[in-house]
Amino acid sequence: MIIGIGSDLIDITRIAKVIERHGERFLDRIFTETERARAGRRDKQPNLVAATYAKRFAAKEACSKALGTGIRQGVWWRDMGVVNLPGGRPTMALTGGAKARLDALTPAGMIAQIDLSITDEWPLAQAFVVISAIPATAS
């Protein structure tokens, strides 16, 4: 059962300009340590760094839309982070207000599954999030 769907499209150059202007203050406010570490591995190529951050920014926007809140009502930027599953597939890890909202949306006896697709083609980055409720399996 689909709980929510969200999408976002962003101009990578916009994120690059914000990083150039606000630097660490912006990065600390928006991105998790995991996301910053991933972008840091691309530090020799500024366009890749900006694209990495832009995709994650778009993913947070898309996830907040799928949660039905946007970035408000207790759902904040660092409550949502892009992580990779063991096979490399991206998903969202939620904490704080975002996790509380997800828990409130998930019906009893179900668990939430977040599917994420992120891509970029200069100068755009795009993200789609589908949040589904799937039956909990007996342990």
UniProtKB/Swiss-Prot annotation:
InterPro entries: 4-PPantetheinyl_Trfase_dom, 4-PPantetheinyl_Trfase_dom_sf, ACPS, Ppantetheine-prot_Trfase_dom. Its cofactor is Mg(2+). Keywords: Cytoplasm, Fatty acid biosynthesis, Fatty acid metabolism, Lipid biosynthesis, Lipid metabolism, Magnesium, Metal-binding, Transferase. It comes from the Bacteria. Transmembrane segments: none annotated. GO terms for molecular function: holo-[acyl-carrier-protein] synthase activity; magnesium ion binding. It catalyses: apo-[ACP] + CoA = holo-[ACP] + adenosine 3',5'-bisphosphate + H(+). The keyword Transferase applies. Mg(2+) binds at residues 8, 61. GO terms for cellular component: cytoplasm. Its EC number is 2.7.8.7. It is found in: Cytoplasm. One of its GO terms (biological process) is fatty acid biosynthetic process. Transfers the 4'-phosphopantetheine moiety from coenzyme A to a Ser of acyl-carrier-protein. Belongs to the P-Pant transferase superfamily. AcpS family. NCBIfam families: acpS, pantethn_trn. This is Holo-[acyl-carrier-protein] synthase. It comes from Rhodopseudomonas palustris (strain BisB5). The lineage of its organism: Bacteria, Pseudomonadati, Pseudomonadota, Alphaproteobacteria, Hyphomicrobiales.
